[in-house]
Design a protein with these regions (language model features):
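A structural signal for the main folded, soluble domain(s) of proteins
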Residues: 30, 158-159, 223, 393-397
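Short loop/turn segments immediately following beta-strands, especially the blade-tip
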Residues: 251-254
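N-terminal active-site segment of His-dependent metallophosphoesterases
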Residues: 1-67, 73, 441, 445
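His/Asp/Glu-rich metal-coordinating catalytic cores
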Residues: 43, 54-69, 74-249
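Glycine-rich phosphate-binding loop signature in dinucleotide/nucleotide-binding domains
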Residues: 38-40, 163-165, 303-306
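Accessory, non-catalytic peripheral segments of nucleic-acid enzymes
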Residues: 256-451
Length: 451
């Protein structure tokens, strides 16, 4: 049986304050669907977060209907679970748009309920369009979905009830415990328990590609849901890292693992992560900002960025706020226009900011305190010598500031957990602390630079 596996499509995701088109996400999804049709796949798995929000807007619903309709017309069975973005609350009984698609006969939605005695594994019934599992092509597909903080406990309950004489494919929207906070991740011992009863574990939730041996896989997000995810295109050694979707073949009689498993990359909008040292411009009384913009345009042109590219520009060096006041939003727009690229985002987290201005003077000049706050965080981080992020204090300081801003904006716990879990800094800390799977092949993660 040939299967395609995607996760974290996030149709409707708003990126760079709406400057990037949401059609990027649909195009990536459509590309993989067309590949599945071309290669005559029999099953198409969606391991959660087809949509970015529980409240789906009509254009994004139409995107899903159109692409899923192509799969249906080609006779490919789509089997899906819901992720944390697909429904408002884990235990909510409110109808979801994933249910709507199931009622429209565009996918089979699997859900497992739990009570005090454990998992309730009911077969999927066409009359109810509901159930925890279904048999198809000699395989038994089981949908665990997103289980939140109780993931380890509930997954063990579920797999303990799986029949040993069946070849199981388990769909789970979760990641390893060193990436997922709030106790919602699985450990290497959890994976061993799952592997004892499962031929293939189809994962989602963490947006970078991960693989455990030859039987468990998270293919990563199809498109960059955040520009920073472009760093996931390379591994820790700097080698290209396939990311986007998984293709596998399972022989039902061979229950231990798939016959073949590959993670493949799909086309996505190019992102260039570039660094510019601002020190030469930081003390210029006149034309400092103009010189900085020109230098940024020069390095973008040197990178031969195409017109459809996004530039993730990181500024470093020392910048004297008494001499040059830089508005990152205005600078990004000006750089974008002069470099003739699709979008530019300017990250000030790596700047060493010098200023003798007081808070009142900063306010009077219309300057944000962001640069000064990051500098203060950086000073504390440098003094602490945090294990695993040596020489990355600036990145860690920027991450702490962004997390503080997310809390200030009252983002949900799930959104904060995703923000923390998607940071490549956690991968560095995890590697330094040997926080990798102790049994089998280590889970492979991202590099710090994009390809």
């Amino acid at each position: 049986v040939k299967l395609f596996h995607v996760a974290d499509v996030h149709l409707g995701r708003r990126r760079l304050e709406g400057r990037l088109p949401d059609s990027d996400l649909a195009d990536a999804f459509g590309y993989v669907a067309d590949k599945a049709i071309e290669e005559r796949a029999e099953v198409f798995l969606i391991a959660g977060d087809l949509f970015d929000r529980p409240m789906v807007e009509p254009p994004h619903l139409r995107q899903a209907q159109r692409i899923l309709g192509r799969l249906k017309a080609s006779g490919i069975r789509v089997i899906a679970i819901e992720g944390n973005h697909d429904r408002a609350f884990i235990h909510s009984e409110e109808p979801t748009w994933m249910q709507f698609l199931a009622e429209d006969d565009l996918l089979v939605l699997l859900r497992t309920a739990f009570d005090a005695s454990g998992a309730i594994l009911t077969p999927w019934e066409p009359a109810r369009l509901a159930g925890a599992w279904m048999d198809y092509g000699g395989l038994r597909f089981v949908g665990a979905g997103y289980l939140g903080a109780a993931t380890p406990f509930k997954v063990r309950q579920l797999v303990s009830q799986l029949e040993s004489d069946k070849t199981h494919v388990l769909l789970l929207h979760a990641g390893p415990d060193y990436f997922v906070g709030e106790g919602g991740g699985f450990s290497s011992s959890d994976l061993k328990a799952i592997n004892a009863k499962t031929c293939y574990l189809a994962l989602g939730h963490i947006h970078l590609p991960m693989r455990y041996g030859d039987w468990a896989c998270n293919p990563g997000s199809l498109e960059n849901c955040d520009v920073s995810e472009a760093r996931y295109n390379r591994d820790l050694a700097g080698a290209p890292l396939p990311r986007g979707y998984a293709v596998l073949e399972i022989e039902p009689a061979q229950r231990q693992k798939p016959v073949d498993l590959q993670i493949r990359s799909n086309p996505r909008r190019p992102v260039y992560r570039l660094t510019l040292d601002c020190s030469p411009f930081g003390n210029k009384i006149k034309d400092g900002a103009i010189a900085l913009v020109k230098a940024a345009v020069d390095i973008i042109r040197a990178a031969e960025a195409s017109p459809d590219s996004v530039i993730d520009l990181r500024l470093t060096g020392r910048l004297n706020l008494n001499r040059i006041a830089l508005d990152p939003t205005s600078a990004a727009i000006e750089i974008q226009e002069q470099a003739e690229v699709f979008a530019v985002t300017v990250d000030l987290g790596g700047l060493d900011v010098a200023s003798s201005l007081t808070g009142g003077e900063l306010a009077a000049r219309g300057l944000s305190r962001e640069e000064l706050e990051k500098a203060a965080i950086r000073e504390v981080v440098s003094a602490k010598h945090l294990w695993g992020i040596d020489d990355r204090e600036e990145d860690f300081s920027a991450f702490c500031y962004e997390l503080k801003e997310s809390v200030r904006k009252e983002k949900s716990g799930a959104e904060l957990a995703e923000q923390i879990g998607s940071s490549p800094l956690l991968e560095l800390i995890a590697c330094s602390g040997s926080a990798i799977a102790k049994n089998g092949t280590p889970l492979q993660g991202p590099s710090e630079e994009a390809g």
